[in-house]
Curated annotation (Swiss-Prot):
<protein>
    <recommendedName>
        <fullName>Maturase K</fullName>
    </recommendedName>
</protein>
<keyword id="KW-0819">tRNA processing</keyword>
<keyword id="KW-0694">RNA-binding</keyword>
<dbReference type="InterPro" id="IPR002866">
    <property type="entry name" value="Maturase_MatK"/>
</dbReference>
<dbReference type="Pfam" id="PF01824">
    <property type="entry name" value="MatK_N"/>
</dbReference>
<comment type="function">
    <text>Usually encoded in the trnK tRNA gene intron. Probably assists in splicing its own and other chloroplast group II introns.</text>
</comment>
<dbReference type="InterPro" id="IPR024942">
    <property type="entry name" value="Maturase_MatK_N"/>
</dbReference>
<keyword id="KW-0934">Plastid</keyword>
<dbReference type="Pfam" id="PF01348">
    <property type="entry name" value="Intron_maturas2"/>
</dbReference>
<dbReference type="GO" id="GO:0008033">
    <property type="term" value="P:tRNA processing"/>
</dbReference>
<dbReference type="GO" id="GO:0003723">
    <property type="term" value="F:RNA binding"/>
</dbReference>
<comment type="similarity">
    <text>Belongs to the intron maturase 2 family. MatK subfamily.</text>
</comment>
<dbReference type="GO" id="GO:0006397">
    <property type="term" value="P:mRNA processing"/>
</dbReference>
<dbReference type="GO" id="GO:0009507">
    <property type="term" value="C:chloroplast"/>
</dbReference>
<keyword id="KW-0150">Chloroplast</keyword>
<keyword id="KW-0507">mRNA processing</keyword>
<dbReference type="GO" id="GO:0008380">
    <property type="term" value="P:RNA splicing"/>
</dbReference>
Amino acid sequence: MDEFQRNSNKHRSWQQFFLYPLFFREDLYAIAHYHHLDRSGSSEPTEILVSNFLSFLTVKRSIRRIRKQNNSISLLGNSDSNKLIEYNKNSSFQLILEGFTIXLEVXXXXRSKHFIKXMDGWNSXRSIHCIXXFMEAKLPHSNYISDLRVPYSIHPEILVRIFRRWIRDVPSLHLLRSILHEWKNSFNRENLQKALITQRENTRFSLFLWNSYVYECESFLIPLIKRILNSQSLLYGSFPDRTHFEKKIKDIVIFPPHKISTKKIWLLKDSFIHYVRYGERSLIALKGTHLQVKKCRYHLFHFWQYYFHLWFQPYRICSLELSKTSFSFLGFFMHVKMRPLVVRAKMLDDLFITDLITNELNSTAPIRSILFSLAKEKFCDISGWPISKLSWTSLSDDDILDRFDRIWINLFHYYSGSINQDGLYHIKYILLLSCAKTLACKHKSTIRVIREQLGSELFTKSFSKEREFISSSSSKTRLQRERIWNLEIXQINPLANFWQKMQNKQIKN
């Protein structure tokens, strides 16, 4: 990949986004073959996997045969959707798709870097907890938030149109159109999301399509919202100088206070916008009036209708007032709460004590939902009483301890920034007893005997890792009043993801 990007300046066709010559480079398919071997695993002998590798001439014949076909192009060889499994296992198609994806990623990498440099204040972080730290710093200064869910039922021609804006290679677009339309014919309308985005056999290509679609949305959406918020100065058309206009407003203080509308005063304040996204979920936080929020909602509906020809369902965007309501994001319950502060200011010999009220964003772990998930996985009953994990009794003692250990460590690190730490330790108690009961059931003994035999080895790894994480972050006294975000976490916790999906379904219904 790096070699293609370094040599891109030497090839004029690449600079003009003509990707078709890349499909006939053997080193490109060598990279694709390397990725294909990594995902195939070691279940098959290496000789069998290597024998399925495509040669240079096979690639040329395959693409030439696709270009010469008329009407609908059948990459499956048969329109029967029941043969989709055999199609996905076809090594030839997999390698063509891998090479096609790598060629597209080469051109898209430079385009995305140019977009990020052009956007002021635009940052792309790897850790998912960077989003939570950013929201704690920025959202308390906002008064409205728009919860947006990006539509994922994408028509293949929409994706082709997106690539056509920066790819001038007609054969490459024809190949992309053939693949996407064949996927659409192989899946029904309800499973279109899986066909285009989350298909397991084509993860690299599916993720690239989704990221390209979201990139196109954000490249138009963010500047559009900024123009909407900054367009409020156009309301003062009769005042060429806004500073002069604000001076005139200050002179109107002689009027009685009850005749001055607070909404009109809000229009004089500079509004700002903050945007975060994870997956299909986006949050647009802004400081402004209710009228500006309605304008943003109106333009968001028409944005997808005119740019992508998609009907934007009303449930996919929800406007909330932060001071009155809470919302869920990344598996957390979040709400803005007022926090009183006492400030002492000393001027010469005088000491002034002032009470200030600030807003802070509190993140809460959904303890009840986590308990429900643990009960569903047979770690406890519906009331939260620990039970033995019978399906794990056939494993070794070390495997049982490691599995319980990983569940607790992942859960503790993910919700380390929540304010309800006591609920997390209650879950730890449930997992600890469930682990002991599982070992007791395996050895046909009691919990007391297991604790006497193992002693400190029971959950020792989790205790040690937890102490290391706490001591490296803060002291014990600071831990009681400060929250810690672990910037090494790169994806959402499975239990948190399950609860977040349930919340999204409730909003949809």
